[in-house]
Amino acid sequence: MLHSSHRPYPRGARVAHLLREEIAAVLPRLHGMSSGLSPLPPSITMVDLPTDMRSATVYFSLMDGPDRADTIREVLQDHAGEIRQLLGRRLALRRIPPLHFVYDARFDRGAEMAELLAHLPPAPEDLP
């Protein structure tokens, strides 16, 4: 028999999902950060949180491609302490883990693959 407090997935996964949503929500509110993130702000794609929850790897993507990835990562990392403070005010967690920002290149690889597939010759109609 399941208890009403049973969760469908582990606490770490729930916290990682919550952190992803909340980091995305606080980015526009960071003081002085908007100039470093314009013209298009990053999208938070995933948060990886180990079972001990002592650190969080925050993956982000950019709508305009990877050219600004290093610059944006530096801006985000420079504001990681401020982001943690804002998260601490918003979330009922005992401790907000240190945040480490990493560019998520999965979407770039997907776009490259779509481009390659678009340039393939059409398949022959009759196959033996």
Swiss-Prot record:
Gene Ontology BP annotations: maturation of SSU-rRNA
GO MF annotation list: ribosomal small subunit binding
Gene, per the UniProt record: rbfA
Pfam families reported in the protein's UniProt record: RBFA
Location of the protein in the cell: Cytoplasm
Chief place of localization: cytoplasm
GO CC annotations on file: cytosol
InterPro entries, per the entry: KH_dom-like_a/b, RbfA, RbfA_dom_sf, Ribosome-bd_factorA_CS
Functional summary from the UniProt entry: One of several proteins that assist in the late maturation steps of the functional core of the 30S ribosomal subunit. Associates with free 30S ribosomal subunits (but not with 30S subunits that are part of 70S ribosomes or polysomes). Required for efficient processing of 16S rRNA. May interact with the 5'-terminal helix region of 16S rRNA.
Subunit note: Monomer. Binds 30S ribosomal subunits, but not 50S ribosomal subunits or 70S ribosomes.
Highest taxon above the source species: Bacteria
Name by which UniProt lists this protein: Ribosome-binding factor A
Keywords assigned: Cytoplasm, Ribosome biogenesis
Family indicated by similarity: Belongs to the RbfA family.
